[in-house]
Amino acid sequence: MRTGVRGIAVAAAMVVALTGCGDGEGTEAVTGNDAVPGIAEGKQKVPPVTLDEAGMIKALPLSSELTHGTYGAGDPVLVQGAETAKACLDTLEVECPGVKTASKKDLALVGSSSDTGATFALFTFGTEEEAAAVLRTLEKHKKEFDGPSGRYTPVKVESGGADEWFAIERKDFVGVYMRIGTVLSYVITDDFGREGAEGAAQLQVGRLKVVAGGGDPDA
């Protein structure tokens, strides 16, 4: 799992996101309190990145922001309350203790008979520790999963500012899974290629941080 904290200007984040460039260096998976900066060192933490219900929808990318083709978007879905844990389990295929709210949007290439498209999903948790624990469980699950289509291959991508992340690939599928504060982000792509998936992940991180900071990513 990759870990790191990067302050990025909004303009730079959007440029990087739309170009889909970068090749990160991998690190060992983070476990325990070391997964959340400041806890292991005993430092006072700044409030973590989080999103309210409106932000969970606003932070999801727009179809017009994907530049390699024309994409149509389904209506974004927001899940709250008792249904959230099931929605998280159904999407991530692992239990999600502490999950509070979920949102999701599908984007598909217009006029294509292929499966080219992307899915963006966000999950907020009560604490960074809860979000980090679910991300570690998810990474372990994906590395061990062996289905009819074969195993996933870990790949290196640059997230554009997530606290922790990992990415996997299988045939035309690339998935990027990230934690930004108390939010888990899930970006999966079909027929985008690794660089296209990386760009989609960076786009998601850029929008999320703008919304969490009280800004409008579409202004």
Model-identified regions with their sequence ranges:
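C-terminal motif of bacterial Sec signal peptides marking the signal peptidase cleavage site
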Residues: 16-20
